[in-house]
Amino acid sequence: MGMLRQPGTEHLEVRGAPRPAIPAPPRFNVRGRIVGVDLGGTWVRAALFTPNGLIAQRVTARTQHGSGPQSVVDQIGALVRGVSMSTSGAAMDPMTVAIGVPGPVDPTAGVVHAASNLPGWHEVPLRRLLESKLGCRCLVEHDATLAAIGEQRRGAGRGVANFAYITVSTGIGAGFIIHNRVYRGGTGAAGEFGHVVVAPDGPLCNCGNRGCLDAVASGLAIAREAGASSAVEVAIAAAAGDQLARAVLDAAARHLGLALGGLINLLNLEMIAVGGGVFGAGAKFWDGMVSAVTQGSFERVRRQCRIERAQLGNDQGLVGAFELVMTPEKRAR
């Protein structure tokens, strides 16, 4: 996608062209298999990587919530074993697994503090559970942080030192790279962009507050407000002229854009890459978001920030998992 501008957005660049690659940082000499896992409220993905970072095998399945965290851990264990043993002789090699989880985590302890889209997930010692089940070293990270690492190393954010990735899918999250280093916050909980309150009298969020971005602009919120089964269904209805669907998408895009504008003001970012299933809602949703970014940000700061579509699609978290293992400054422990 080329340069996209709207009236009044002369200093807001929206691009999709690849950026030049930067020299790769030093890497650990990791022997054996590396498996990345991207755990979401709807889907869980696992991929086995080649030593040079290409995906050799992958598997995707609906998240089996079952009786809670243990059901999901059992499912992840089965998926990881499946992809990691798919290559002849691979079972003899050591393995490292890196997993992204949708909620605040302590990456040092490997504990998931909470995950609003994963029922029953409170203070879950995920690293310990996975290491016990798989018998290998495991790293645990916020899913949007892994996606940010993937996009900054090999996607839209290549060469950008101050970068954020925003995912808008089942839920909404953010990952930050500041001065070329992952920013996790004081306790590892940075990135809960979906719980920025944008409508204090709005719908109740899973976290217990009202009017969170998650509750008004996520895929689940869009579908709920329109009485549909998914945000894609809402987008199809909007394209066909359904006025309710159009109004729901317009409101979600505006809330998201205003929140992004505030993020630009706060962090003086060079680039924000956005991705996730909701952007399948079409150009009107994108344009509405971009317009609201302009309204919600300070022009002097905004002119320095590009907004781009993420480039790695559903692989960004998996690629970020590989980079987390292989790149020293991005390791969780």
Q: What is each of the regions a protein language model found here?
A:
Residues 2-96, 105-111, 127-138, 150-160, ...:
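ATP-binding/phosphotransfer module of carbohydrate and carboxylate kinases, centering on a glycine-rich
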Residues 38, 98-102, 165-171, 175-177:
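Short beta-strand segments
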Residues 61-62, 119, 189:
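A generic structural motif
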Residues 110-121:
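A charged helix-plus-loop insertion that forms the helical arch/lid used to bind
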Residues 140-142:
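Short loop/edge segments at beta-strand edges and connector loops
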Residues 147-153, 173-176, 195-196:
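Adenylate-forming
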Residues 149, 160-168, 175-187:
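Hydrophobic alpha-helical segments and helix pairs
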Residues 189-198:
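Short, intrinsically disordered, charge-biased short linear motifs at domain edges
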